[in-house]
Amino acid sequence: MNHLNKLMERLGHQFNNLELLKIALTHRSSGADNNERLEFLGDSVLGFIIASELYQRRPQAREGDLSRMRASMVNGDELAQMSTKLGINEYLQLGVGEQKSGGKRRRSILADALEAIVGSIYIDAGLETCRRCVLNWYGERVDDLSKLSPKKDAKSLLQEWLQARRLPLPTYEVKITGEAHAQTFTVNCYVKGLPHKTEGVNTTRRRAEQIAAKRFLELLDDGKGDGITERDQ
């Protein structure tokens, strides 16, 4: 019995070309034939599928709201959680160094692998099969799309807060540490003329910026950060 059969059962698709799934599970630290190209494709396919569902289910929503709702569905945290739920982490092929550093639990690797699998299903069986799989993974969240609230991210809210008061836009200073396969991003956020300075630390630059922006808002107005998401944009 092929060791990938259980995973294919969870994914809801039996691959015609099993090599596509194997590549989708192979991180760049493991060798040259890795999942980066499939991830690139899968990112676009996944975004299209969710955008299409939102367009159909939210006919009155504005473009900006649709974009924010899509972002909440395909951000790194959401994809990493889904990847773990599907058990993709159990099948990842990583280099020795990446394995030792806990790569099978790393959010970015899990999210990238899920996108690569989306790309592999799209190539293997086409858009409709891929759509069916993706919507099945999201489960009840798909049904909730018609009720989804378009929350703004912290960076957008901070920019709006400053613009409303005719203040300069924030500056985000980024410091990168660690090896290429395990980088840490430290972002400092400040606004010229204001005394505050906040820091956000994460394994992705975008999320570190969101964390720093959320903390800055909380300093500007106690409670301002309530309900603000720190998701990737």
UniProtKB/Swiss-Prot annotation:
Enzyme Commission no: 3.1.26.3
Record field: catalytic activity: Endonucleolytic cleavage to 5'-phosphomonoester
GO biological process: mRNA processing; regulation of gene expression; rRNA processing; tRNA processing
Predominant place of localization: cytoplasm
Sample GO molecular function, one term: ribonuclease III activity
Short name of one Pfam family: Ribonucleas_3_3
Record domain DRBM: where: 153-222
PROSITE patterns from the UniProt entry: DS_RBD, RNASE_3_1, RNASE_3_2
UniProt cofactor(s): Mg(2+)
UniProt subcellular location: Cytoplasm
Enzyme class: hydrolase
Matching InterPro entries: dsRBD_dom, RNase_III, RNase_III_dom, RNase_III_sf
Active site per the UniProt annotation: D43, E115
Disulphide bridges: none
GO cellular component, one term: cytoplasm
Role noted for this protein: Digests double-stranded RNA. Involved in the processing of primary rRNA transcript to yield the immediate precursors to the large and small rRNAs (23S and 16S). Processes some mRNAs, and tRNAs when they are encoded in the rRNA operon. Processes pre-crRNA and tracrRNA of type II CRISPR loci if present in the organism.
PANTHER family in the record: RIBONUCLEASE 3, RIBONUCLEASE III
Family: Belongs to the ribonuclease III family.
NCBIfam families in alphabetical order: RNaseIII
Descriptive protein name: Ribonuclease 3
Gene name of the encoded protein: rnc
